[in-house]
Amino acid sequence: MVCHPRLPLIAGLDFGREAVYVWDASDLRTLGVVEAASPSDGRGRGPAVAWHPEDPVLLIADGGPVRCWTPAGVSELTKFPTGYRNVAFGPDARTVWAIPTVTDGDPWECSDVVDLESGACGKGPGWDTGVAAHPAGGLVLTLRSNQGATLGIFARAGDGHTVAPRVLRRALILDVDGYETPIFSPDGRYLAVRGNAYVNTLDVFEFPSLDNVLSTTLGEPSPGYPYPQDWLDRMRAWSRHNIAFGTRPGVLWIGTPTGTLVEADLGNQRSLAHDIPSGAAVTALAATASGDLVVADATGELVRLAASADRAVASPAAVTDFLAGTSDVDADADLESQLVLTDGARTWEPGDLETVDTATDSDPTWLRIQVQMNHAR
């Protein structure tokens, strides 16, 4: 589920049917259903959606024509290029960032920046896993995935100088691939990343420090390859879309396959489980613009849980501090050679990883591979 950042609207993605539902967040009334416009690519990927920053406008991309839902109905953006699998509104709401690129660029290295009215297409930096905007504005976070490691790429946005995001040198590095779009807390003090391709991980970082305050595996840790089928079944019972920040500062909610919502207090490092009304497995969890939690379960039921407090307002100071501690990359040079990487505990300046010569079994896969490559040189 993807909630509108300002209005009481929810977009629900049905990957089995390859359809998008639009609900009124105040009473969970269905406002529309948008069926897939193109056949499945066979990878189990459903449509991607993006809400307009202010208006009741939803873009739907599924590899065919990009379509637009409004309260008046569904229309096709006929001036847009076709073939996009993911889209995001730029902060000015007049441009759309889209992947994969349909220009002559390398799909890994660049994306498209499309004018919403004319369909005119320019180039932006590469990304592959959704775009998360900091609630105070001026900064976005997206992912660049690789089987060995995934980079969390930060970029300036909405500063009036360019419609494309401007990539910054400071970046996150996550083990392996297969992550979902990151989410920021309403007050902008935390960001959470749900993953990954091999096990159910959850990482939460403070912002702007990027210190890791929670790194855990949901359910049982991996028993190692080859994976027993019963472990795979239990692992796959967890929804990949089961986290949300509510109104209480520093609290992350986690939906479970046993019909509970876990209230995780990041500051006190404590958690408390709450039963959902149906007792069925949580299949999706999101927070509305007002801070209410919306829970979808395995029975198909949708429940809204009222917020217990007013939603916090993010301060621009955190973004200002983050930007002051980094700089733009040179768009004409190799990206990865310019990045200052952190995993939330350690930091590597450009060139540092080429000299790392030791790693333990507890280190992430990407770091152990890097050490092996350094020894082979």
Residue ranges and their predicted role:
Residues V282-T342, T347-A376:
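Blade-level signature of beta-propeller repeat domains, shared across WD40, Kelch, NHL, RCC1
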Residues A25-D27, T70-G73, D115-G119, R156-D159, ...:
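Short loop/turn segments that connect beta-strands within beta-propeller blades
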Residues E18-Y21, P65-R67, D104-V113, Q147-I153, ...:
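Structural motif
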Residues R29-G32, S75-L77, G122, T162-A164, ...:
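A structural motif specific to WD40 beta-propellers
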Residues V2-P8, A48-P56, A88-T95, A132-G138, ...:
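Blade-terminus and WD-like Trp-Asp/Gly-His loop motifs, strongest in beta-propeller folds
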Residues M1-V2, G42-A50, P81-F89, P125-A133, ...:
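Repeated scaffold domains used in trafficking and secretory/extracellular systems
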Residues E35-D41, P165-L174, T216-R236, G325-V329:
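Surface-exposed loop and turn segments in beta-propeller and other repeat-based domains
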